[in-house]
Structure formats: C-alpha cells, structure tokens
Amino acid sequence: MAERRVNVGWAEGLHARPASIFVRAATATGVPVTIAKADGSPVNAASMLAVLGLGAQGGEEIVLASDAEGAEAALERLAKLVAEGLEELPETV
C-alpha cells in the first residue's frame, strides 16, 4: 500500500473550502484514496462528509493511502496540494 504523511497546509484546516478543494482533487485523480489523522481510522477521501468529519486542523499530520494502480502519482499530487494549501490539484509534482 502506498502512503504519504503530510501536514495540513491550510491555516483553517480541512474545513469548508479547503475540504471541498481536497475532495474534488481526490475524485479527479481517479484513484481510490483514504485519508486519516495520524492516529485515526481512514475514511474515503472522495467523501465530503467523511473529510469534514475528520476535523483535521491546520498543521496537523494526516495520512493519505491507496493500494490501487496509479496510487504513487496520485498520492504525491494530493500530498503537495494539502501540504502547500493549494487551490487546485497540481498537474505533476
């Protein structure tokens, strides 16, 4: 299983707008991805309710994971998005 640990770069954490950006990006990868707090249970990264339910704060470590084909590239792109608090999924890393 591919995994990336990254700190949330959005000051407000994964709430409202940043969560929406992240969920759209996770869906756009076409790869099933989970997201979890470092000490928590993984949830579907493409689910707005699940991502909001994490309550991840700015600066908090999260874990992105997937065992699907194409996971490495998808996780790298999502990790960059989260770490840098970007507005959209980067094309490449």
Curated annotation (Swiss-Prot):
<dbReference type="InterPro" id="IPR001020">
    <property type="entry name" value="PTS_HPr_His_P_site"/>
</dbReference>
<keyword id="KW-0762">Sugar transport</keyword>
<dbReference type="GO" id="GO:0005737">
    <property type="term" value="C:cytoplasm"/>
</dbReference>
<dbReference type="InterPro" id="IPR000032">
    <property type="entry name" value="HPr-like"/>
</dbReference>
<comment type="function">
    <text>General (non sugar-specific) component of the phosphoenolpyruvate-dependent sugar phosphotransferase system (sugar PTS). This major carbohydrate active-transport system catalyzes the phosphorylation of incoming sugar substrates concomitantly with their translocation across the cell membrane. The phosphoryl group from phosphoenolpyruvate (PEP) is transferred to the phosphoryl carrier protein HPr by enzyme I. Phospho-HPr then transfers it to the PTS EIIA domain.</text>
</comment>
<dbReference type="Pfam" id="PF00381">
    <property type="entry name" value="PTS-HPr"/>
</dbReference>
<keyword id="KW-0813">Transport</keyword>
<dbReference type="InterPro" id="IPR050399">
    <property type="entry name" value="HPr"/>
</dbReference>
<dbReference type="GO" id="GO:0009401">
    <property type="term" value="P:phosphoenolpyruvate-dependent sugar phosphotransferase system"/>
</dbReference>
<keyword id="KW-0598">Phosphotransferase system</keyword>
<feature type="domain" description="HPr">
    <location>
        <begin position="2"/>
        <end position="89"/>
    </location>
</feature>
<protein>
    <recommendedName>
        <fullName>Phosphocarrier protein HPr</fullName>
    </recommendedName>
</protein>
<keyword id="KW-0963">Cytoplasm</keyword>
<dbReference type="InterPro" id="IPR035895">
    <property type="entry name" value="HPr-like_sf"/>
</dbReference>
<feature type="active site" description="Pros-phosphohistidine intermediate">
    <location>
        <position position="15"/>
    </location>
</feature>
<comment type="similarity">
    <text>Belongs to the HPr family.</text>
</comment>
